[in-house]
Amino acid sequence: MKAHQSLHVVAGFVRFPMSKTGQSRCYSILKDISIPASKQKFVPSSGTYPKGFLAAGAHAGVKESNTQFPDVALICSETPCSAAAVFTTNKFQAAPVQVSKQVLEAREGADITGVVINSGCANAVTGKGGLEDAKSMSAKVDECNGTPSTSSKRPSTLVMSTGVIGQRLPIEKILNTIPVAHSSLSSTHKAWLTAARAICTTDTFPKLLSRTFTLPSSPNHTYRIAGMTKGAGMIHPNMATLLGILCTDVPISPAALKLLLSHAVSRSFNCISIDGDTSTNDTVALLANGAAGGQTITTPSSPNYAAMQTVLTSFAQSLAQLVVRDGEGATKFVTVRVLNSPSQADARAIASTIARSPLVKTALYGKDANWGRILCAIGYTQGIQAGTVVPERTSVSFKPVDGSEELKLLVNGEPEIVDEERAARILQDEDLEIVVDLGGGERGEEGMGGEEGIYWFCDFSHEYVTINGDYRT
């Protein structure tokens, strides 16, 4: 049974000023938080947030160039939570990743009270000192919550950081700011949006969503989920690619929460790509405090499990897609869908290869229907089964956003005569879908299959190089 959902994403922007040109990109959001006109529609002007969760953002000045904007965020629950997280697979895991893992393992995903996040410095590859800094951030929040961690009492706050790698945190600034943020914790939309703003780096807009929904066992009972994320570059999954904090007031056990999050991440944050790089810091955490009451979800056989999985996966996909829409220098949001593969793994591998191809991405930026680059990426995909890609069965097309007929580029290995004028019109739109049909037929046919894989990605522009060339300046 599917859950009923209501998405609170309202066009408009209430506090962050728009740039004079309406189109400028913030190369460093700490210097300029102007929101391009085309991005304002993605910033919510209202929201409905989970019961018992509070948010705040405050200014610490982690980067010396940041003299006024929030760069420390807190998300706290008024009651202890179940928590789960998925972390980067990068071998150089940042100090906050290591500390958050320790917190979750020590408490077995139970009795977590919140998350503290800083932007402006990744606290990655910073040695033992960096680990102590991350631990002190967790301890300071616990102290503010009135539950200080001691030698016999384990920390209960997760830690996240984002920014430049290889630099120590200005830890005293952050520790002095945490009580300031804690004193302003609130359940208001303003507080949540300020927290979402505080975790931004090269992002052009804060990424915040909230939804209300019902579950089968309590059809007249309203539940809530909210989440924020950051990320515009160094985005390619495995997990993960960014920072994400999701909160819900549904009662869920730690074991069930871990399963729910893993499934959702594999179909959302692990299906996006900006530039093919996987960060040292990236983390997606899910907190559930049960404040809305009702039956606790404990196992996949629980009455509400399947419906909750649907809600969470859909919500995570919406958050992940916001990251792609804010890709550094991006002008396009592209969906690549691979059909009729012998396995979902092969379909996703092919979609991933297309999504991270610089030649595909630059062609799309140039509005060039150069489908040969797509075909090339399909052909060099690594790690797929023999026989997955058969040139004589492969078809490629562009699917316009207006719902009109697909523009066929290649059909069963034979090139089509392409209407270049129509192709140019399709590529003028911000959104585009690329459909790759491997011609595997319906599931069950011998040697064939009907599995599908999907990825979301953006194009590469001149601006991507400028942003990343200037990142530390």
Swiss-Prot record:
Catalyzes two activities which are involved in the cyclic version of arginine biosynthesis: the synthesis of acetylglutamate from glutamate and acetyl-CoA, and of ornithine by transacetylation between acetylornithine and glutamate. The keyword Ligase does not apply. GO terms for cellular component: mitochondrial matrix. Keywords: Acyltransferase, Amino-acid biosynthesis, Arginine biosynthesis, Autocatalytic cleavage, Mitochondrion, Multifunctional enzyme, Transferase. The active site is at residue 241. This protein may be expected to contain an N-terminal transit peptide but none has been predicted. Pfam families: ArgJ. It comes from Paracoccidioides brasiliensis (strain Pb03). The alpha and beta chains are autoproteolytically processed from a single precursor protein within the mitochondrion. It catalyses: N(2)-acetyl-L-ornithine + L-glutamate = N-acetyl-L-glutamate + L-ornithine; L-glutamate + acetyl-CoA = N-acetyl-L-glutamate + CoA + H(+). It is an enzyme of class 2 (transferase). InterPro entries: Arg_biosynth_ArgJ, ArgJ-like_dom_sf, ArgJ_beta_C. The record marks 162-163 as: Involved in the stabilization of negative charge on the oxyanion by the formation of the oxyanion hole. Pathway: Amino-acid biosynthesis; L-arginine biosynthesis; L-ornithine and N-acetyl-L-glutamate from L-glutamate and N(2)-acetyl-L-ornithine (cyclic): step 1/1; Amino-acid biosynthesis; L-arginine biosynthesis; N(2)-acetyl-L-ornithine from L-glutamate: step 1/4. It comes from the Eukaryota. Its EC number is 2.3.1.35, 2.3.1.1. The keyword Transferase applies. The record marks 240-241 as: Cleavage. One of its GO terms (biological process) is L-arginine biosynthetic process. Heterodimer of an alpha and a beta chain. Disulfide bonds: none annotated. This is Arginine biosynthesis bifunctional protein ArgJ, mitochondrial.
